[in-house]
Curated annotation (Swiss-Prot):
Gene behind the chain: ligA
InterPro entries according to UniProt: BRCT_dom, BRCT_dom_sf, DisA/LigA_HHH, DNA_ligase, DNA_ligase_AS, DNA_ligase_CS, DNAligase_adenylation, DNAligase_N
Residue ranges of domain BRCT in the record: 598-681
The species this protein was found in: Nitrosomonas europaea (strain ATCC 19718 / CIP 103999 / KCTC 2705 / NBRC 14298)
Reactions catalysed: NAD(+) + (deoxyribonucleotide)n-3'-hydroxyl + 5'-phospho-(deoxyribonucleotide)m = (deoxyribonucleotide)n+m + AMP + beta-nicotinamide D-nucleotide
NCBIfam families: dnlj (TIGR00575), PRK07956.1 (NF005932)
Recorded GO MF terms: DNA binding; DNA ligase (NAD+) activity; metal ion binding
Name of this protein: DNA ligase
Membership in a protein family: Belongs to the NAD-dependent DNA ligase family. LigA subfamily.
General function of this protein: DNA ligase that catalyzes the formation of phosphodiester linkages between 5'-phosphoryl and 3'-hydroxyl groups in double-stranded DNA using NAD as a coenzyme and as the energy source for the reaction. It is essential for DNA replication and repair of damaged DNA.
CDD domains attached to this UniProt entry: LIGANc
Length: 681
């Protein structure tokens, strides 16, 4: 069972990540992750906070709208918050939204206003007695940036309202976008000028609107679409529905999306969604979904708001754009941790504003699940409009020459054996000490403080050593000299001497540190200590097979196989020999826990958990007796546990054993079980 501390740490990590991405998206207008990935983070946070409401904090992203604005522009406080909308990604979520509305209003059918969801920047316009006086970005929803001068340059924003205009203050809200044709024209001009082009219309609109020099904004073609109103005086026009607001804004010469409409009930919402998704590409501007709002303003008022969004509205997001193309080949990329990832090489295709030639296939299971073959016509989606992904095969178009994909059993980079451990989806290169693709990670880990501990060997220095081909494996570190190091960037003679001294000092280490430094997958510090304690000798450890390794306490089949695979790879053994020949050494431990070599063990391979206080034995004594008879003792109860040995005052482990139906022994029963074999010797 996951502890509450673990949940709290997960919540803190999610909040920190979302806050950082909010800053990139809302403030810098330079998102670093796809929208779909952000949505997944936010939904995960929402779900966890719903499960653990007592862990919700006031500063959680779910309790606010966005991120604080920059201090570059003057700040403008919104009289009424510019809230974001909750998102729906499926028809089921839309149906659930409609059901909540009907139940809250106690009516059978709801009249909805529906409109496109522009992919631009939300803007507030303030008119005083019919004259545009202020304009601001949404910012964090409560305070935005005053960009009045820039907004005044946009032709589709009226500087003066039509007579009769509302008296006092009147706020219009909408979205600034760049039309597709204007975006293409701007990028063409950028290319001619030798300047950086924009990735998509939204980025172009953001970059244009947030210029400190409004003359630059004036040269960019931006368009404003109105979709609502904010604060206004009581003596201003009285509206009863949202559609009436849009109609009024149109009379004031604001652009209002022609696709705005009204529908009845969930069926009407879904029909509108399908209609807009079908015409999405033909629209003059980018949209990433549609917006549903309860049309009746009195009903909106009754439904109210949550801290982040109105209850009466929701955004129904479109799936990422999808197109078909030919899969020309499947190549393997090797990551810095040794993961082998199949990558589709595609006939070039334009998806979501960019030309795509590669797409991730994730892993071998995904290729098989989707029945992907080389030569297939595949559907490519830009997941989150950023990461290209092969989502399906058009089997009807499969050519006769299509070839099945076979995951390689050797690393394409270094030739080492590639293995896939049980219960893992990823195939990995076992040449961790040798593989060029893993070189940087292997050297940094080897030299880290808890491993061999080479003081002064940081990431930037390792980059230089690798880039200049001075170091290929950790063993090469011990061949570096002062003159070579002094020739590197930011490495004077003194720094070089200090590093050579640190490298020399690192030769005297311990066996647990050395084992940990090798970077064997699943082998942390505790496991390295256990391996050293129970073998006492590196050669012995390197020659053990997976079955023998499992006789060591807390070494399960997956970890055992990972260790065996690592040491069976000749490249790794060669690097280890080089390290030893360079002078790395350690003292042998004074006590070595030897697994019994007897063949007639009482409990070979059985797993025990101890809980409570035993009458005549300490836990260590009980553990030693169990291990002498081929068993192993672990610290937690699971379905893999063979027996739980309970003394007086047993803890939660006892209750867990009862829950799982695992046999519970007292001390006498344990001794009897262990004597069954010893008495027959």
């Amino acid at each position: 069972m996951i502890s509450e501390n673990t949940i709290e740490e997960r919540l803190q990590a999610l909040r920190a990540a979302i806050a950082l991405h909010d800053f990139h998206y809302y403030v810098q207008d330079a998102p670093v992750i796809p929208d779909a990935e952000y949505d997944a983070l936010f939904r995960t946070l929402q779900q966890l906070e719903q499960q653990y409401p007592h862990l919700v904090t006031p500063d959680s992203p779910t309790q606010r709208v966005g991120a604080p604005p920059l201090k570059v522009f003057a700040q403008l406080t919104h009289q009424t918050p510019m809230l974001s909308l909750a998102n729906a990604f499926s028809e089921e979520e839309v149906t659930a939204f409609d059901r909540r509305i009907r139940e809250a209003l106690n009516i059978d059918r709801v009249d909805y206003a529906v409109e496109p969801k522009f992919d631009g920047l939300a803007i507030s316009l303030i008119y005083a007695n019919g004259i545009l006086t202020k304009g601001a970005t949404r910012g964090d929803g409560y305070t935005g940036e005053d960009i009045t001068l820039n907004l005044r340059t946009i032709p589709s924003i009226p500087l003066r309202l039509q007579v009769p205009f509302p008296t006092g203050q009147f706020e219009v809200r909408g979205e600034v976008v760049m039309l597709k044709t204007d975006f293409e024209r701007l990028n063409e001009q950028q290319r001619k000028n030798g300047e950086k082009t924009f990735v998509n219309p939204r980025n172009a609109a953001a970059g244009s609107l947030r210029q400190l020099d409004s003359r630059i904004t004036a040269m960019r073609r931006l368009t404003f679409f109105a979709y609502g109103i904010g604060a206004y005086h009581e003596d201003q026009p009285i509206f009863s529905t949202h559609s009436e607001i849009l109609a009024y804004l149109a009379t004031q010469q604001f652009l209002v999306a022609r696709q705005s409409s009204t529908v009845m009930g969930a069926n009407g919402l879904l029909a509108y969604y399908r209609e807009m998704n079908a015409v999405r590409l033909s629209l003059p501007y980018e949209i990433d979904g549609v917006v549903y709002k309860v049309n009746d303003l009195a009903q909106q008022e009754k439904l109210g708001y949550v801290s982040r969004a109105p209850r009466f509205a929701i955004a129904h997001k479109f799936p990422a754009q999808e197109v078909s193309t030919e899969l020309l080949a499947i190549e393997i990329q090797v990551g810095r941790t040794g993961a082998l990832t199949p990558v589709a090489r595609l006939a070039p295709v334009f998806v979501g504003g960019v030309t795509v030639t590669n797409a991730t296939l994730h892993n071998e299971d995904e290729v098989q699940r989707k029945q992907i073959m080389i030569g297939d016509t595949v559907i490519v989606r830009r997941a989150g409009d950023v990461i290209p992904e092969v989502v399906a095969v058009i089997v009807e178009r499969r050519p006769t020459h299509a070839q099945a994909f076979v995951m390689p059993d050797h690393c394409p980079v270094c030739g080492s054996k590639a293995v896939r451990l049980p219960d893992e989806a990823v195939t990995r290169c076992t040449g961790g000490l040798y593989c060029p693709a893993q070189r940087k990670q292997a050297i940094l880990h080897f030299a880290s403080r808890r491993a061999i501990d080479i003081d002064g060997l940081g990431e930037k220095l390792v980059d230089q050593l690798i880039d200049r081909e001075l170091v290929h494996t950790p063993a090469d570190l011990y061949r570096l000299d002062i003159d070579t190091l002094a020739g590197l960037e930011r490495m004077a003679g003194k720094s070089a001497r200090n590093l050579v001294t640190a490298i020399e000092d690192s030769k005297k280490t311990t066996l647990p540190r050395f084992i940990y430094a090798l970077g064997i997958r699943h082998v942390g510090e505790a496991t390295a200590k256990a391996l050293a304690s129970h073998t006492g000798d590196l050669d012995r450890l390197m020659d053990m097979n997976a079955e023998q390794l499992q006789q060591i306490p807390d070494i399960g089949p997956i970890v055992a196989q990972s260790i065996a695979d690592f040491f069976s790879e000749a490249h790794n053994r060669e690097v280890i020999e080089q390290l030893l020949s360079c002078g790395l050494q350690w003292e042998k431990p004074s006590h070595i826990a030897q697994p019994s070599s007897r063949t007639n063990l009482a409990v070979p391979g059985k797993t025990f958990v101890l809980t409570g206080t035993l009458p005549t034995m300490t836990r260590d004594q009980a553990k030693n007796r169990i291990e002498q008879q081929g068993g192993k003792v672990t610290g937690s109860v699971s379905s893999a546990t063979s027996y739980v040995v309970a003394g007086s005052d047993p803890g939660s482990k006892y209750a867990r054993a009862i829950e799982l139906g695992i046999p519970v022994l007292d001390e006498d029963q344990l001794l009897s079980l262990l004597r069954d074999t010893s008495s027959s010797e």
